[in-house]
């Protein structure tokens, strides 16, 4: 917009320089105008025309301002040194000629009225500018001088506009719109319309304020509007022409299209504020680089044009397409899920056969599909054999010299040798080979059979036999000397170790460990045998050979029994006493231990005397109450039976009606005064021997002497003296044998009276009908009960079962429990009457014994309680492999174990589901390709 009272006019040059500068300025203005016209995209303008759009500023953006406000302080600073003057009317024809002498592009090629319009405009501008002082004008030569800074040139170029465009901000916007891309056509059209309207307003205002306000003012404004309309029409025609040219280029030959694109040049914009450089290709965000812009910098040839053809066609087709609106977020997510599901499904399809095979297999062994290690064979080792040691090299060289380095060479040599033999010689050779093979086979079979024999006796006999055979072989002096040296070493070792005696430390240790290991027992036996051999040599006896004799660990053929016993007893006597601590180290415990050792020494001495045949009448420790010597049971020194022999039993057997019912002897220990009733009872008892003869000693039927104590029993009413006396006497009795009560004889046992004609008949009767008498107290009684229970196990099974069943029935039967508490919930005190409270009986439901499933089954106990944990494990239906209930139950009843099934079936049944190898890395399974 123009400043109020002034019109934007071209500066008026002075004289010759004035005409020359004016001409140059007009040419420059026309050139800039042509560039702006060529850069304006008319395609968008026509589209907006067809759609009914009108050019102009939006109502919200339009506002009315004065020309004084339009020219602000910034403009005043900018144009402070400038002066503007109108052009003369005489120059209008020259301007018109210069306009016609420009390039082909013009404002209106069809109408010649533009010349008159432009001339009128210039005359009007000149008339307006005649009032300006000429001293304030600037020479164009100075303005356009090359030495002028670029800032002034840019300012001059930016302030000079075509005659129909005013010097205002909207005109500048219009120029920027002409340089912009086609994508912003709508904005450019609105701004162009706005600039045209503002131009008309500025022109009208300037003409109203001018000194000449006649009829020419309306004509000037109309001519400007006509110029704008003509310019828009020319742009529309040019757009159509450009479209036709573009279609012809696309339809023409490829070479022509590439050349057309390459010929197109980027036009220079005089209003660019940035310097031209490769770093400033894009001036603003609205400008973009197309593929055609890039092709301009490439030198073209035929091959490159052919290769760039699809790019050009693709870029043109893509630019013509429009993008579709994006789908909704939910639809996009659903499509993504479907694609992901398909991808996952395809990945899982690879694993289905592997998973199915693993589920069907009975056993999985990891690592799976492991390659078997190559096992070296004899042939492979022989083929790859290389001699390493010196001996191997010598043997290999000898075989090479003999021509027997391999089996094939050996066969060839044998064939050559056989070819020179006769038929009889070949047959004899074959017979010898067959005989040797037979001997080798028999020897191998015998060696296998001998290796399976585990008998020590056989080993010893075989060893002695080999030694004899070796002794028969004549030996050289060297062998004899070696044997003599070995025997001397053995004798020296024997003297140093003294293994033939029982006094050495080694023998003591071996005897202590003799019961813990087989090797130790063998060492002890060897020591005893060695000592026996030395004793025989000393006495001048020959060592007995063991051929054909059974050799056992403690056999009489190896050594004398007396010496064996003495050796064992000597070991016991030489045992060192361990250091006792704590309770065992107290005096009374040591005294008890000494008493025990004294008893053991007496027993050992008595046993040695018994073996030697020396009677010992003073020794009562080995005799019973009746002076009967003890008898070993099963060669066990710890168990001794003090029973009379068969002869003594026959002589001492009393003749009575019932020989099996006997009264035990009564042992009176410090018997106190007894009451009259007790005296009468004691008088009725008889003292008779409780033992009766048996044919042979039976450890299961050992009945020790039965004794009963008739000592007075203490009670609450006993005096203190009686209690003290009883305590003292019991301390003395503690060291004696434990008291055993007299066995009670059942009265319903009726024994038939028989006349014993002889002792033999009595013996037979006793052997048949002796009742079982069990001791009731002591350690011996407990062991005796255990032995009897094991021997006669199962006799009272029925009674125990019936008792257990009765307990089950009573436990499951209905019960009534009384929960009432006496005195609970009642008043107490003097004068309070006690009321009878009803008992609080709680009935517990149960199973009636008559309604039990096993009520009529005496041999069965059925548990009718429901187990909730077991109910979860019960099968509601028959499992898959079975077809009926009977098959399933039969499989459950089938026993498992090596006793009922074969070894292979048992291993298959108990094989684990997964087997892993220790130390092996289990890699993850890989899916097949």
From Swiss-Prot:
Biased composition (Acidic residues): 35-50, 59-75, 107-117, 133-144, 188-220, 605-619
Composition-biased stretches (Basic and acidic residues): 23-34, 670-681, 712-729, 805-820
Nucleus found in the keyword field: yes
Subcellular location: Nucleus, Nucleolus
Annotated stretches, region: Disordered: 1-257, 602-729, 805-843
Domain of life: Eukaryota
Phosphoserine modification, residue list: 251, 555, 557, 758, 760, 764
A Gene Ontology cellular-component term: small-subunit processome
Gene Ontology BP annotations: maturation of SSU-rRNA
UniProt entry keywords in alphabetical sequence: Nucleus, Phosphoprotein
One protein family per Pfam: Utp14
Biased composition annotated in UniProt, kind: Polar residues: 696-711
Protein known as: Uncharacterized protein C57A7.06
Composition bias, Basic residues: 833-843
Listed InterPro entries: SSU_processome_Utp14
Family from the record: To yeast YML093w.
